Amino acid sequence: MKAFRFLPLFACFLFIVGCTSSTTEIKTGPGPGETWRAVHFLGYETDRELRELEKTIPKLAEMGVNTVIFEIDYNFNFNSHPELRRGASPITQKGSHRFAETCRKNGIRIIPEFQCVGHQSWEEETFPLLVEFPHFDLTPGAFPDNTGIYCREWDVLNPQVNSMIFELMDELIEAFNADAFHVGMDEVFLLGSEHSPSTKGKDPGELYAKAINDMYNHLVKGRGVEMLMWGDRLFDGKNFEFGRWESSLNGTASAIDMIPKDIIICPWHYEKMKAYPSLPIFIEKGFRVLPTSWRKVDATKELILYSQKLKNPKMLGHLFTSWGKTDWLKYQPLEEGLKLLLDK
């Protein structure tokens, strides 16, 4: 009988040990001070496509990847606003849960992305928000069939847009059990446009900062998650030869001094350059920085080497993109770039 008295205590001991080991066995994502080795996924729009991508996760983890930014946009089976689902079979909650769990089991942090403000169309296709709610369009009635425009944008001064988009963000955070969120925000060109009834003549920098701060208040202050965004609209290109794409020539760059400094900035540069001044500028302003490259191996390596030479703790690591489906296990910029990142 005495032996049986100790069984409950012994069982509790085993339970505690089991819980402790299960929570410490797998470290998810980069730890404090550890280099981010991140990849950006785009173009996977159904559960079936997500399952195929999932098969590469263990190997990517072996290669050294520890962070995934998954751009999902409207390709999700939203419950709050089913009218905003894109495609016949968008990604489901079950599919996203499964993918996120596979990432975590392999030590990879998963960060969903939803493109905000800009990129509300591509070529002739306008995306669901502005199709279902055309009065949310920043330039309503202008640019029929999206001709003469890069991408449509939503109206940053319409409070109804935020309330709707924030509900979508909340669903994606829950679906991926995420502790960070990427809001996009690149290549925004129409703030203050003469074609925009609500923002015509207004300061693009102030408008852009308002949009960022609205999202920050919801995501960081409200949900307690980290916020990431692209950096091109915050990098003033007037004194540099980076052009209108990788830097801002339309007045949005002044927003850099109007937004919280704990946002993670992802400045993207795709060509080989002698220097990448956006990186030290963002660091000096107090931001953490995650430089981003694309398909050119030499440019990718140059950007990584330049970032490493800065030797600053706010330099997080590197983000690799392909801007479409690709064989990530044979993607040369990733292979060669990881060698430099792991060499440290």
Where are these predicted regions, by residue range?
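The substrate-binding groove and active-site-proximal loops of carbohydrate-active enzymes
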Residues: 38-48, 81-93, 146-163, 197-207, ...
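Short, acidic/polar
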Residues: 46-61, 166-169, 273-279, 300-306
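Active-site-adjacent "subsite" loops/lids of carbohydrate-active enzymes
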Residues: 117-171, 291
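Substrate-binding cleft of secreted/luminal carbohydrate-active enzymes
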Residues: 290-344
